[in-house]
Amino acid sequence: MEFKDTLNLPQTEFPMKGNLPNKEPEILSFWEKINLYQKLREDRKGKDKYILHDGPPYANGHIHIGHALNKILKDILVKYQSMKGKDAPFVPGWDCHGLPIEQQVEKELKEKKIKKEDLSKSEFRKLCREYALKFVNIQKEEFKRLGIIGNWEKPYLTMRPSYQAQEVLELGRVFNKGVAYRGKKPVYWCIYDKTAEAEAEIEYYDKKDPSIYVKFKMKDSDDTYLVIWTTTPWTLPANLGVMVHPEFDYVYFKTGKGTLIVAKELLENFKEKTGLNGEVIKQVKGKDLEFKEYYHPFIDRVSKVYLSEFVELGTGTGLVHMAPGHGQEDYIIGQRYGVDAFAPVDDEGRFIQEAPDWLKGIRVFDANDLIIEKLQEVDALIYKEVISHSYPHCWRCKNPVIFRATPQWFISMEAKVNENQTLREAALKEIERVKWIPYYGQNRIKSMVENRPDWCISRQRSWGVPITVFYCENCGEIVKDMEVFEHVANLIKNDEFGADIWFEKLVKELLPEGYKCKKCGGQEFKKEEDILDVWFDSGVSHAAVLKYGEWEELRWPADMYLEGSDQHRGWFQSSLLESVASYNRAPYDTVLTHGFTLDEKGRKMSKSAGNVVAPEKVIKEYGADILRLWVVTEDYTEDIKIGFNLIKRIAEDYRKIRNTFRYFLGNLYDFNPNQDYVPYENLLEIDRWMLSKLQNIIQIADKSYEEGKFHKIYHTIKNFVIVDLSAIYLDILKDRLYVYAPKSLERKSAQTVLWELLLSLNKILAPIISFTAEEVWQYVRKIDSNIKESIHLEIMPVVNEKFIDKNLEETYEKLLEVRDDILKAIEEARKQDLVRHPYEARVILKLPKEYKEIVEKRLDWIKFFFTVSQVELSDNPEGDVVINGESVKDSVIAVSKAKGEKCPRCWIYDESVGRNGQPVCDRCKIQLEIMNIKLEELA
């Protein structure tokens, strides 16, 4: 027998290498086999619920890194709440309607040389449904591969008949509250997709446009002109007024081009820009100009000056050309003065017959140059240049949009939703009540809701939920009775293809039998052809899924909505407005937002830049747990960087965490927690110190999970594993675990704490590195078969007050300071070739009183803490290397060669080795006797 055969060396089959790309699918199969999601529901039945409502991703294309970030964050939170003992179900969902799917289907039809016009609406909708379902199934598998646990068997889809039916009922509630109305007002309009757009569908990009100063001749004076500035010359045919601020000062500036009226504060800027010189001959207040008349420069039309609080003095002239059909603020002022929302432009952005002949059929952006030429021709152009400015674009086709007044359905922000409040007021009140993480999200959504226009909910497309209202053919009355909405909702719910029936059935088949107009008694009706905005689709998910849905595990309202910060103007807002309109309450209590993903250099990702990181690639190379770990490396409330150099570093951190678990398992192969667990009071002091440290970790982790600060958990555990454990405690422990007899108190005390560390750290990390935690857990079950069959069925560790010993922690902080100085002295001795290993060292210490007393009390075993062979205290230390301590002031550390010979079993140098022919040190001799091993049996 060799000496190494007498040591308790680690034994485990837990692999050093994770091989996650191959291992993780096995764990997924295990979760499916045991039906983990259902088991969790059974296990947590009757417990307090925690509902995180999933904001539905769009069913188009493969998932990208932003999807992965979002779903992993949700999964971490849900798993944590579940491991806190709550019933935390997760029902994933998909947004299935909308223009991008229509465009993809149209593209596929084009490839097959089929015209969309040759298909009925139902046939086209069927193709859209199939396309959406294909990507729901693709994305479902991709999300599952990330380790997301949820009700994948029964997700919610906005195109399901039951969902569409509930959406129709929600629409009915909104109508019956008097919040919805039909009106003609300017909305964002995409001239390429030929549909209205929501504010949330708008993206801003830089665009080059003409910037022109134009003079409008005053009616009451031969040579006096109002001067306006615009970057949209194409809107001039729709000009029906000029707006001035009532309180601003305006001057009459006499020049060679006539007397020009501009804001006093902008005169110098105007002179500099145009190069015009002259003199101010008169000054008036804006309110003095109200109702003054002027001639349109190229259309035979007289219009007036109106007062507007929206006029600003940032740029231009302080006089704003007013086209109520092409601007939100223009429209508001137009309504105030009874001016029509005139927009002589069709769905494709082409001028129609109400425009001058020379513009008919021309697209708006192409008309700019023609209009500028005309202004020059009639001597109305004062100055022109080209500027680059931020301009709204369609998020789908990336083309610039216009404001265009068209008949649409709106949800009014000023309609009363209860006795005391308008929708805007009630929504703002709820914003105050809801908790926003990070806190500045509250101000963001608050300012958006304060300033937003009425919500345009109608779209002129095919693939969506219809606006289920009827019009009386006899008197024009809009039919919006709740009984009609309920009747249509019932038809949709019970039809295999849901809302398709609206486009297939005759009007009389959609109305209740014998239905008559409440106003005139007429029985002839026509149905609305527009569909609902997709933001209304997803905005009613709180009702269609949580409140009235078919998932008994859910409840309304949600505890948490968690999405990207762009959803303050998207899903958070549409859900808030719909819920407040219908139920006078926000559908959520807390809203948490994350930032966007950037490349390693902090740049936006794009295919053209070649810096896109696909989740699939990371998973294939490194595994999903590395991606999950990436999510918690930084504060995700800010933008978060990703790239393969970063992923490599995270994989290295993962390796250290994994090897720590391997250390635990390897040294617990003979530990039976039911028999070998050492009571706290019998533990060795250093083990009690580590238990106290562990309680701090549990406390920080719990607080950080509660606050959603997952990066704090990652950095806390990373430092604990690399510094406190690997570099200190586990390093010190090796001697005791390997050398002492298997059943000795010294070894069992260490194993007891390793067991506590293993259970606690694995549970804390389970929501984050879910696959690895499960893999570790299955090895833990070999040690204790009584524990739950999955780590995710377990409960988070709680702080054990009995284990907290702050005095002991302070004592060990001081011992660690001494240890730091000793290691520096040994490193110096190593450089001088005096020692190769710390065990070869004898250390003599001179310490200040407080430190000396601490070491003196522990002198019989402190050498193991310092990982040297001998430790002595002296007021005058001498040795081969002598240094002054840095961590402990007024300390001196001397290092010499250790006395005695090296024990071949424990490698510590001791004077008992070789004495009277004894081959090992006294300590090893005692341990071997306990183990019934005779010295003569050893080689």
Curated annotation (Swiss-Prot):
A motif ('HIGH' region) lies at residues 57-67. Its main location: cytoplasm. Its cofactor is Zn(2+). ATP binds at residue 607. Signal peptide: none annotated. One of its GO terms (cellular component) is cytosol. Zn(2+) binds at residues 903, 906, 921, 924. InterPro entries: aa-tRNA-synth_I_CS, aa-tRNA-synth_Ia, Anticodon_Ile_BEm, Ile-tRNA-ligase, Ile-tRNA-ligase_type1, Ile-tRNA_ligase, M/V/L/I-tRNA-synth_anticd-bd, Rossmann-like_a/b/a_fold. One of its GO terms (molecular function) is zinc ion binding. It catalyses: tRNA(Ile) + L-isoleucine + ATP = L-isoleucyl-tRNA(Ile) + AMP + diphosphate. NCBIfam families: ileS. IleRS has two distinct active sites: one for aminoacylation and one for editing. The misactivated valine is translocated from the active site to the editing site, which sterically excludes the correctly activated isoleucine. The single editing site contains two valyl binding pockets, one specific for each substrate (Val-AMP or Val-tRNA(Ile)). Belongs to the class-I aminoacyl-tRNA synthetase family. IleS type 1 subfamily. Monomer. This is Isoleucine--tRNA ligase. The gene is ileS.
